[in-house]
Every structure is written in C-alpha cells, then in structure tokens.
Design a protein with these regions (language model features):
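Conserved Nudix-box catalytic region and its N-terminal flanking loop in Nudix hydrolases
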Residues: 41-90
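Active-site segment of metal-dependent pyrophosphate-handling enzymes
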Residues: 86-134
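A structural signal for the main folded, soluble domain(s) of proteins
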Residues: 33, 37-38, 43, 82, ...
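Nudix hydrolase/Nudix homology domain
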Residues: 55-60, 119, 125-179
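Acidic, metal-coordinating catalytic segment for phosphate/diphosphate chemistry
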Residues: 1-39, 115-116
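A structural signal for short, well-ordered beta-strand segments
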Residues: 32, 77, 81, 126-128
Length: 179
C-alpha cells in the first residue's frame, strides 16, 4: 500500500521511468531538519514530522525530497520546505548551502546504517532555521517541536525508521548538542 501523496508535477520522470532509474542510478535528495534558534543561534527546538510509512506505521522523519533535473540545491531545499511545512514557514537558508553531512541510503543494510528500500539515494542533509508559522502538508500528519533533549530521548529515537535517528543525532552534534 502506498500512502505517499502523488506529486502533481513530478518535474522530470514518469512513475515507470523513475522506477527504472532508481534500479540503475543513485538518486540525489535534500533533507532538511527544521529548527528554531535563540538570539545567539543555539538550537532551542527541532521540528520532526510524523507520517505514515508504506507499511501503515507512524514514523518520525524530516523534510526530504529529490533534486530535479536543472534545479539548484537551494531551490530544491526551498521547494521541499514549502511543500512539507507550508508557505509561511519562512526558512532561513544559509548563505552557502553546505550540508552538515552527506547521507547515503541503500536498499539493504550497509555500513552507513541508512536504508531506503526503494533505491540507492545520496542526500545532502541540512539544519534549517525557520521563523514563521509551520503548517505540515503533503504526507505529514503533524509537525512536533521538541527540545533537543526530547528529540534525543530513546522513545523519540525509536520512532524513526531507516537509520534516520542516527542522522538526527549527527545533526544535533553538529549544532553543539551532546558534547
């Protein structure tokens, strides 16, 4: 059962062509973890999306999506942030779009610990401050704002799939948490 919202303008490949491409090529993605920061730039809250997996389970995840042909990384980030968080989220993209890490997903378990059963994907992962009102859309059922300590709790970490809990820990370590 597929619970994903169909993209009315997929931008580059039909579903059949995408399936064939995923079997042959790594897909390029952006992933964004929305955060709220204090006046000194320290992360106060982490925004985690809740959505239903293809198996019907409730899982935590991040803003994520493919980079389309001839689309810049910055444009892909903005498009997916608006698609998942709404047009009033007001994301603050950094002057230089350098990711905190490059995440490699494989269709079966690998040394990276990240899995995506659909494909081999390479994701540029970002922490993105947002200052506006977020209204989760598309596949997301809700957006929960948690303190970094809450987001790192075992109960929240257990709600991630595909190794994304480790990616969240890495993101917060990059922002100075867990030292």
């Amino acid at each position: 059962m597929n619970v994903r919202t169909p993209d009315p303008n997929p931008g580059w490949l039909s579903e059949d062509d995408l399936y064939e491409a995923r079997r042959r090529l790594p897909m390029v993605y952006v992933e964004a973890i929305p955060v709220r920061c204090d006046s000194l730039g320290y992360v106060n809250e982490v925004g985690l999306l809740l959505q239903a997996s293809d198996q019907g389970e409730m899982v935590r995840t991040f803003v994520s999506g493919r980079v389309m042909y001839r689309e810049t990384i910055r444009a892909a980030l903005l498009r997916h942030l608006e698609k998942d968080l709404g047009p009033l989220a007001l994301p603050q993209l950094p002057p230089s779009p350098v990711p905190f890490t490059i995440a490699e997903y494989f269709p079966s378990p690998s040394e990276t610990g990240l899995t995506d059963d659909r494909q081999h994907a390479v994701a540029l992962a970002y922490l993105i401050p947002v200052t506006g009102e977020c209204d989760p859309r598309q596949d997301a059922l809700e957006l929960s704002w948690l303190t970094p300590s809450e987001a790192l709790s075992p109960s929240i970490q257990a709600e991630f799939s595909g190794g994304r809990a480790a990616l969240l820990r890495q993101a917060l370590a990059h922002a100075g948490w867990g030292r």
